[in-house]
């Protein structure tokens, strides 16, 4: 199974680290709060301190600049199977939306939130998707008896958005 590692820090430090490992599949994410390095590999990462995930689902090859949305979803340890089953059986419509270049469903190795990462050609494409019929369909069961029960969550989900640098 493919692994994914994410580490956070300053832009200067992480861009230098990325340059030192340009043979690796690494992406630099930036926003007004700082930066993150994202590393997908079938082996261990060169990061000294990173959050480790298993890639449960991967669609699209993302290797160029754009926009990424990281949806952090805290899930109770005892409810992980329920959560994962829901994502394994998802409709998979976001991948066919204009501007969507890929998606990753990331299972945390430690007690961190799951991450659903969607990669876009630009922020505008993500915003367009949020107001689309496909978005409504994908989220139609939220807050209903057909949706995931609130008890599976160990905290409130949150989004982080970044520009993806070259």
What are these regions (language model features)?
Residues 14-34, 41-54, 95-98, 123-155:
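An amphipathic, aromatic/His-enriched active-site/gating alpha helix that lines ligand/cofactor pockets
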Residues 10-21, 78-102:
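Short amphipathic alpha-helical segments
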Residues 75-77, 122, 163:
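Non-catalytic surface loops within mature trypsin-like serine protease
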Residues 2-8, 30-42, 68-73, 106-132:
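Short, well-ordered beta-strand segments in beta-rich or mixed alpha/beta enzyme
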Residues 46-84:
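Surface-exposed beta-loop interaction hotspot
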Residues 61-66, 79, 115, 155-166:
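Short, low-order "capping/linker" segments at domain edges
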Residues 104-106, 160:
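General small-molecule cofactor/ligand-binding pocket signal
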């Amino acid at each position: 199974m493919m692994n994914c590692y994410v580490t956070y820090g300053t832009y200067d430090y992480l861009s230098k680290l990325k340059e030192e490992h340009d043979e690796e599949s690494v992406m630099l994410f930036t926003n007004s709060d700082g930066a993150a390095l994202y590393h997908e590999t079938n082996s261990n990462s060169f990061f000294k301190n990173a959050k480790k995930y298993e890639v449960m689902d991967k669609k699209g090859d993302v290797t160029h600049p754009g926009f990424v949305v990281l949806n952090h979803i805290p899930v109770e340890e005892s409810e992980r199977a329920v959560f994962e089953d829901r994502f394994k059986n998802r409709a998979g419509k976001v991948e066919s939306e204009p501007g969507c270049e890929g998606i990753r469903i990331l299972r945390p190795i430690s007690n961190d939130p799951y991450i659903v990462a969607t990669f876009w050609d630009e922020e505008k494409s993500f915003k367009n998707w949020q107001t689309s019929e496909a978005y409504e369909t994908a989220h139609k069961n939220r807050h209903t008896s057909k949706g995931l029960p609130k008890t599976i969550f160990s905290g409130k989900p949150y989004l982080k958005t970044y520009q993806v640098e070259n």
